[in-house]
Amino acid sequence: LDRRQRQMCIRDRPIIYVNQVGGQDELVFDGGSFAIDAQGELSVSAQTFIEAFPIVTVDRSSDARLAPGDTVAEREDLDAVWQALVLGMRDYVDKNGFPGGVLGLSGGIDSAVTLAVAADALGHERVEAVMMPFRYTASMSVEDAKAEAQALGVRFSNLSIETLYEAFMTTLADEFSGLPANITVSYTHL
């Protein structure tokens, strides 16, 4: 707000800044509409990341001065980022008609944060977390993933991918027979 306010007050005129709020595909519009008077003083402001309908009163009898109205405090940076993520996810899911979301949960911090955003955006009843452990997955990761889902009240499934891996390796066995098993085989053999 401060940067926009500074830019606008150099014009020596009252300014009403109106911004939409909501997510549209990969974009998130923060809302936060406001009005400043000719001296650069904030007259009216709306909260960011929620729909708001602030009232701006223009006194036409006195050189279009703005009457003081309701103002809100700006969000802290971390709160603004959180609200942007929540709003973007909620609008993306809802506007595309999805019933909810399913996400892979590893037990790590990145998927835990994603799960928390999803639960906040959609409600715990519209989110399902799936842990897909493999032979190298630590039991602590499985336990952490389950605890994260339980803490947020999200449905949790533990589906091992071991049998999928074995089926995949069996399917490729003839193509790669006689070659050493390593990560570069797929590139050198092609």
Language-model-detected regions and their locations in the chain:
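Phosphate/ATP-binding catalytic cores across multiple sugar-kinase/actin-like superfamilies
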Residues: A80-V102
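C-terminal beta-strand edge segments of enzyme domains
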Residues: P14-V86
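ATP-dependent adenylation/pyrophosphate-handling site
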Residues: P99-L105, I109-K146
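A conserved beta-strand->alpha-helix junction
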Residues: I50-T57, R126-M131, R135-N182
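Short glycine/serine/threonine/alanine-rich loop segments
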Residues: R13, F98, V154
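Structured core elements
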Residues: Y17, V28, F34-A35, L42-S43, ...
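Single conserved hydrophobic/aromatic residue that forms the stacking wall/gate
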Residues: L1-R6, I10, H189
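Glycine- and acidic
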Residues: A67-E76, F98-L103, V130, G178-I183
